[in-house]
């Protein structure tokens, strides 16, 4: 059986190449493949209790280590809830990467749970 490299694998490999060691968030179905790829690439995923705290933790990693960290919130409200932490990191000029999920195009307009337009 041949395994195929996914977009998530490519993203995780690039994040690792740029020095990311941690990713934070509350994953939903839309980002599970990315979380798996990050862990396989050696990026430790830290499950948080809220999206804002995940964003603040990601910012703290950069502030303490100088290495970029990753925020992986679920789609819609998950990403919206993280905005206060993202804004704080922006004000501090932190090197953070936010990779929010999105529903599959074929589900848009049909399956709208937590979808943002």
Question: Model-found features: residue ranges?
Answer:
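N-terminal alpha/beta PP-like core and its mobile active-site loop of ThDP/TPP-dependent enzymes
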Residues: 1-117
């Amino acid at each position: 059986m041949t395994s195929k490299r996914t977009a998530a694998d490519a993203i995780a490999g690039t994040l690792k190449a740029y020095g990311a060691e941690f990713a934070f968030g509350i994953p939903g179905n839309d980002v599970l493949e990315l979380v798996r790829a990050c862990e396989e690439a050696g990026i430790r995923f830290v499950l948080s209790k809220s999206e804002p705290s995940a964003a603040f933790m990601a910012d703290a990693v950069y502030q303490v280590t100088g290495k970029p960290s990753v925020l992986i919130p679920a789609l819609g409200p998950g990403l919206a809830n993280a905005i206060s932490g993202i804004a704080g990191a922006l004000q501090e000029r932190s090197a953070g990467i936010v990779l929010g999920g999105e529903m599959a195009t074929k589900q848009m307009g049909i399956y709208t749970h937590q979808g943002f337009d």
